């Protein structure tokens, strides 16, 4: 089942109420303008339903096999249905038109500024004028450039607007009666933010030569119609105070959809209206849903840009109705609109209305030559009907005529942009809107060529692949009507007429694989509601296919389907769209211009100002405005100031009346009398201050600035400085002479240029010259000083030549002499001097002053000890420096203090001599009493500056003697002092004697005589063969020393692979050493080794035997209580050991039975002993192979007997049913079997030990 659709597209339905925004309009804003939105007023009806509507309708048949028509949702409008404005190939020209507009304002603003500068000095205003003129020059260059791009033009538009705004802001300071003295002649209304409320006006008199009656402060009839309403029944303006209704929407298509079978709702008898308030600085919109019947406001919201609100009243009318959402869409904002209001429900956009801008509607009063006399601006909302300010009387002018002109709409004339597209099955076309006048537009329809196979632009204005179908007549809003409809009947594309259906037939497609094709058709479909047949056009397609159920081919369209004629879908399907060709855009405002001509009964006097080159330097001023002929004037009194300041800031002084000037005094004549004055540029004198190299040491100063030519100046009197401090240094004027900077004259000023760092060589006195900026330069040199360092001893004697630390340094420079302060000085004669810091004279650190600073370092002469070493020439004798302490220069020298080398001074040791104190020949003390070779402690010098000789005296010869206790010499005497030593036959007693002469005697005693002996052990066989090397058991030892050779007595010895065993000992194994050698001989016999036997052992995991050892190699076997682990070990002798583990214990019981096996007592768990049972006597105990115990009893006879005394018997093996021997189980931890096992293990070990003993 296919659906049949009818949808509404209003190609003119988007209201456009913008205008150019002064200072804020350019080509860029054109590109950002908002196009109309498709789907405005979309509706859904049944396929066979005819809707009488002023809205456009799209009819589309898409049902291939069924006659049932199904209502469909209204078409959704999205970003793909809208398009930004696209410019044509003339976009550069359009942009230049905007640039011409904004540049036309620049001269007017600059002229006003010049007039103010002629009366007062204002540097800020002068700078703003200069900037505006600079930007104007650059803009004119772009206007003249035939190859300029849109981007370049737009950049100039922006630059000029910024400059003009800045200049306009400066001019606000200069007003007359609170009004600016000029207004701009612009083509478009001013949408610049204003403080005026909607309906308020403001007048400006531009021509200062005239007066206006009524005053420009009066509205003079200027007014607005506050609301912009359609002439539809029931639609009224808002009643909210200070709000103005600018548009409404009648909910027509929304209601048709809600009442359709799709929604099953109901129509809402209301309309929505939108209003702006009277504050032009705001953009909030009041949205009101209003009852058509009562006029009551059903629901309302104030919407800020970017917000959305929801109206819920429709659901109160019928629950199936959709809520209405109104979105203030700022994505559509531009310089001429804050955005658009989108009316939607369920994402279907039914209406899009652009919010108008606030704008100034200007009435102009101009002359026939185009000169603007005055303007009156009225604050409006774009689209409001304006009553202009009426004709006024201007002195000296006569009214001629009135003209009106529509204000530019949202886009400038020539703008082209995509209005919308239709892509329904085989119906494929686009609509492009072109602005042909400020208040007029046309629609151009292009259908897609059915044979075109290339790329298609559905989002822009590129018509490649399209064929132009028609262009509508220019449509606009006419006061008193609702819509303006198309009246153009011309079809652009080639077509033929199908007389059977009275439709125009256009191009057809190629056949597809099924033999089907389609062709484009159209039909004028307007009526009285569209003001004629050409107010609506039906654009559709027919398909070439077969009639359903037959092979009959033919052309079929949507109307056939609706008439019940069914046909096959062979790849193409027909569709159709009704297009209402109307303009729903109200006209933009109209501005009025009154034209005047000059009256011959009046005249005026203006004054112009020129420089000496004949160039006008400031704008003309009006001396006498339009006045009756014969009125007296005198410009010398009123309009000849002593000086003027040009727009570029140049100062001029009056010089004379220009040769072609009118008289400066007289009476007014018809027309304009022009008086011309000549002014000459002011002159200046600047003073510079540099050093001899040309470096600036003080900022230049102005001695005379913008002074009148001919005026005397004297910089020596006013600016010459004797000294200057710069960067902490003092500078003074230099005398006349040549310097790097150049030649300096007697006035201390530069008169010839040197190194080109300074070039001001004008004289220091003279006269101001017109247009000349004189430069005087004074030359300075830094004031200098020197620092000298002297070196003297404590007596004031010079010990070293003076040194210059700094020479000719600028005063104030830092200096330090510490780098020229040696701690020691050695003079040419070899004398040593040590610095005494406390006696330094002068400041070591400081700043240079003019003159010479002297710093004197004082040194102490430091002498030496001179050791007079015997046999050494006097010139070669060493010198031992005094350890002088410069921090304590007045303290005696301490000879034990380390010197400058860090060592304590000492007098050298000379063998055979002793150094003595020269004062009293007292021997000096050795530094180390035990080692005089380390030197001697020097004596304390009496004068640190005088050498102290150290004499050496010979010392007496000493000897060393070695004697026994009786004093007899036992070794030769030795010279010097020698230590004791080893002497054969003697030992040192520890006594040494030294006499007063230093002779040493060591005392010894005789060593006692000792007899020694040794003990040797031999190893031989019975026949005396040595089978082992002899061993010294006891080396040489004193007689009587105990010895024992058993530690050297092996039981066996292996010799040449055969084993020998000890059989006897010859000699004494234990005893005492005697003089000489004691011999002990061990005698051995060869061992005959029998063949080894192997055995098999059975042990548990701990190595304990669990069965008797067996000779030979036996396999593992079953052992009660144990199980084989699977492990068998064979040692190096071939013995085998099987390893077992204990079998887990099972639960056992104890039974008590008679000899027939009958129980005579209860069975007991575990192994329990026999017990006394009445009437029975114990016989024996049997333990089965499971470990269960059975005690057997014999029944007693009635005959009493005397019990026999039991005799303990050795345990015997009980008999079991199987006849196997069974060990009794006593229930104890160590059973008999365990004891037997232990005994067997002990026996085995004993046997093993005995075997090894035998082997030994």
From Swiss-Prot:
Places the protein is found: Secreted, Cell wall
One Gene Ontology CC term in the entry: extracellular region
Small repeat boundaries on the chain: 663-681, 839-861, 1064-1084
Membrane topology, record value: Peptidoglycan-anchor
Biased composition regions of type Polar residues, renumbered to the chain: 1033-1045
Gene3D superfamilies associated with the record: Immunoglobulin FC, subunit C, Putative peptidoglycan bound protein (lpxtg motif)
Predominant localisation class: secreted
Keyword Repeat: yes
Top-level taxon of origin: Bacteria
Propeptide: 1227-1256
Large repeat start-end pairs: 953-1006, 1089-1142, 1143-1195
Region (Disordered): 873-949, 967-994, 1028-1049, 1102-1137, 1196-1229
Alphabetical list of InterPro entries matching this protein: LPXTG_anchor, MucBP_dom, SSSPR51_Rpt, YSIRK_signal_dom
First and last residue of the signal peptide: 1-47
Matches recorded under PROSITE patterns: GRAM_POS_ANCHORING (PS50847)
UniProt motif (LPXTG sorting signal) ranges: 1223-1227
Modification Pentaglycyl murein peptidoglycan amidated threonine occurs at: 1226
Record keywords: Cell wall, Peptidoglycan-anchor, Repeat, Secreted, Signal
NCBIfam families in the cross-refs: LPXTG_anchor, repeat_SSSPR51, YSIRK_signal
Name of this chain's protein: Muramidase-released protein
Gene: mrp
């Amino acid at each position: 089942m296919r659906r049949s659709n009818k949808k509404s597209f209003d190609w003119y339905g988007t209201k456009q109420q913008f205008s150019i925004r002064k200072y804020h309009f350019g080509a860029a804003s054109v590109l950002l303008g908002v196009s109309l939105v498709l789907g405005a007023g979309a509706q859904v009806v049944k396929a066979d339903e005819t809707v009488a509507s002023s809205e456009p309708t799209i009819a589309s048949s898409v049902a291939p096999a069924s006659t049932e028509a199904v209502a469909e949702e209204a078409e959704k409008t999205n970003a793909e249905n809208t398009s930004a404005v696209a410019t044509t190939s003339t976009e550069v020209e359009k942009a230049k038109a905007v640039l011409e507009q904004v540049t036309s304002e620049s001269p007017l603003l600059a002229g006003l500024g010049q007039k103010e500068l002629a009366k007062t000095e204002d540097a800020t205003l002068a700078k703003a004028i200069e900037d505006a003129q600079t930007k104007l020059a650059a803009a004119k260059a772009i206007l003249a450039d035939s190859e300029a791009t849109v981007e370049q033009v737009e950049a100039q538009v922006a630059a000029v607007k910024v400059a003009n705004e800045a200049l306009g802001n400066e001019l606000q300071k200069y007003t007359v009666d609170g009004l600016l003295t000029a207004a701009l002649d612009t083509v478009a209304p001013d949408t610049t933010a204003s403080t005026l409320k909607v309906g308020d006006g403001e007048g400006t008199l531009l021509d200062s030569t005239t007066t206006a009656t009524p005053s420009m402060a009066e509205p003079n009839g200027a007014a607005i119609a506050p609301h912009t309403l359609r002439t539809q029944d029931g639609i009224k303006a808002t009643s909210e105070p200070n709000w103005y209704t600018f548009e409404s929407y009648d909910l027509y298509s929304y209601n048709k959809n809600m009442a359709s079978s799709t929604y099953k709702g109901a129509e809402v008898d209301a309309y929505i209206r939108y209003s702006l308030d009277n504050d032009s600085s705001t953009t909030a919109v009041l949205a009101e849903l209003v009852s058509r019947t009562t006029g009551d406001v059903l629901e309302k919201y104030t919407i800020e840009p970017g917000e959305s609100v929801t109206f819920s009243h429709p659901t109160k009318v019928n629950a199936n109705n959709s809520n209405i959402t109104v979105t203030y869409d700022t994505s559509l904002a531009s310089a001429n609109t804050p955005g658009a209001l989108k009316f939607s429900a369920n994402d279907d956009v039914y209406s899009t209305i652009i919010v108008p801008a606030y704008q100034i509607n200007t009435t102009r009063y101009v002359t026939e030559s185009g000169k603007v006399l005055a303007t009156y601006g009225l604050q409006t909302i774009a689209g409001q009907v304006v009553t202009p300010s009426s004709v006024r009387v201007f002195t000296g002018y006569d009214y001629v005529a009135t003209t009106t002109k529509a204000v530019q709409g949202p886009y400038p004339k020539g703008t082209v942009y995509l209005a919308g597209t239709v892509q329904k099955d085989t119906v494929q076309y686009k609509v492009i809107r072109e602005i042909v006048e400020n208040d007029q537009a046309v629609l151009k329809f292009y259908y897609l060529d059915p044979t075109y196979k290339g790329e298609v632009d559905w989002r822009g204005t590129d018509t490649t692949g399209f064929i132009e179908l028609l262009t509508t007549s220019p449509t606009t809003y006419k006061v008193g009507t609702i819509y303006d409809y198309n009246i153009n009947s011309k079809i652009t594309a080639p077509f033929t007429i199908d007389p059977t259906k009275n439709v125009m037939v256009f191009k057809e497609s190629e056949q597809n694989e099924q033999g089907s094709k389609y062709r484009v058709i159209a039909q004028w479909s307007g009526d009285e509601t569209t003001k004629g047949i050409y107010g609506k056009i039906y654009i559709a397609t027919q398909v070439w296919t077969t009639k359903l159920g037959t092979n009959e081919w033919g052309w079929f369209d949507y109307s056939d389907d609706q008439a019940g004629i069914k046909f096959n879908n062979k790849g193409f399907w027909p569709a159709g769209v009704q297009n209402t060709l109307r303009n729903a855009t109200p006209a933009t405002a109209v501005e009025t211009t009154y034209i005047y001509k000059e009256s011959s009964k009046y005249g005026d006097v203006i004054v112009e100002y020129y420089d000496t080159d004949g160039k006008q330097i400031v704008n003309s001023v009006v001396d006498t405005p339009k006045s009756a002929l014969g009125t007296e004037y005198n410009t010398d009194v009123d309009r000849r100031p002593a000086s003027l300041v040009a727009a570029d800031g140049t100062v001029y002084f009056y010089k004379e009346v220009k040769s072609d000037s009118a008289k400066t005094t007289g009476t007014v004549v018809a027309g304009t009398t022009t008086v011309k004055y000549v002014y000459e540029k002011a002159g200046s004198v600047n003073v510079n201050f540099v050093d001899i190299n040309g470096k600036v040491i003080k900022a230049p100063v102005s001695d005379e600035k913008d002074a009148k030519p001919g005026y005397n100046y004297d910089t020596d009197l006013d600016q010459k400085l004797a000294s200057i401090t710069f960067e902490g240094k003092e500078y003074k004027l230099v005398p006349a002479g040549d310097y790097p900077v150049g030649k300096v004259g007697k006035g201390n000023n530069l008169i010839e240029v040197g190194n080109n760092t300074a070039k001001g060589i004008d004289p220091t006195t003279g006269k101001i010259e017109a247009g000349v900026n004189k430069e005087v330069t004074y030359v300075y040199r830094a004031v200098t000083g020197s620092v000298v360092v002297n070196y003297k001893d404590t007596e004031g004697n010079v010990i070293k030549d003076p040194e210059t630390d700094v020479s000719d340094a600028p005063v104030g420079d830092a200096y330090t002499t510490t780098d020229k302060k040696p701690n020691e000085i050695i003079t040419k004669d070899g004398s040593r001097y040590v610095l005494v810091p406390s006696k330094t004279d002068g400041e070591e650190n400081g700043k240079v002053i003019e003159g010479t600073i002297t710093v004197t370092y004082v040194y102490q002469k430091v002498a030496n000890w001179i050791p007079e070493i015997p046999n050494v020439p006097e010139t070669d004798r060493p010198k031992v420096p005094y350890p002088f302490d410069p921090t304590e220069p007045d303290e005696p020298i301490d000879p034990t203090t380390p010197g400058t080398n860090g060592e304590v001074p000492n007098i050298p040791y000379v063998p055979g001599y002793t150094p003595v104190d020269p004062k009293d020949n007292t021997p000096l003390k050795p530094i180390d009493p035990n080692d005089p070779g380390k030197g001697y402690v020097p004596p304390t010098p009496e004068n640190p500056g005088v050498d102290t000789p150290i004499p050496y005296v010979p010392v007496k010869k000493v000897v060393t003697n070695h004697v026994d206790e009786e004093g007899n010499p036992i070794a030769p005497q030795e010279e010097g002092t020698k230590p004791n030593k080893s002497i054969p036959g003697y030992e040192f007693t520890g006594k040494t004697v030294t006499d007063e002469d230093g002779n040493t005697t060591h005392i010894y005693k005789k060593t006692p005589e000792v007899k020694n002996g040794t003990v040797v052990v031999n190893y031989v066989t019975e026949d005396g063969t040595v089978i082992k090397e002899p061993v010294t058991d006891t080396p040489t030892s004193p007689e009587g020393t105990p010895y024992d050779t058993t530690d050297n007595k092996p039981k066996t010895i292996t010799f040449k692979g055969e084993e020998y065993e000890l059989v006897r000992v010859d000699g004494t194994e234990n005893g005492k050493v005697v003089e000489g050698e004691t011999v002990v001989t061990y005698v051995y016999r060869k061992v005959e080794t029998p063949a080894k036997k192997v055995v098999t052992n059975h042990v548990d995991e701990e190595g304990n035997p669990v069965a008797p050892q067996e000779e030979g190699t036996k396999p593992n076997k079953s052992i009660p209580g144990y199980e084989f682990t699977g492990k068998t070990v064979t040692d190096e002798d071939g013995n085998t050991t099987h390893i077992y583990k204990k079998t887990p214990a099972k639960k056992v019981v104890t039974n008590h039975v008679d000899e027939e096996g009958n129980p005579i007592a209860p069975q007991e768990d575990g192994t329990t002993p026999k017990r006394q049972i009445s009437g029975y006597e114990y016989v024996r105990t049997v333990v089965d192979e499971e470990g269960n115990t059975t005690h057997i009893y014999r029944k007693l006879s009635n005959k009493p007997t005397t019990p026999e005394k039991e005799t303990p018997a050795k345990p015997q093996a009980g008999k079991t049913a199987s006849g196997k021997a069974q060990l009794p189980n006593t229930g104890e931890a160590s059973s008999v079997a365990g004891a037997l096992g232990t005994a067997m293990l002990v026996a085995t070990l004993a046997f093993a030990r005995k075997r090894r003993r035998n082997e030994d």
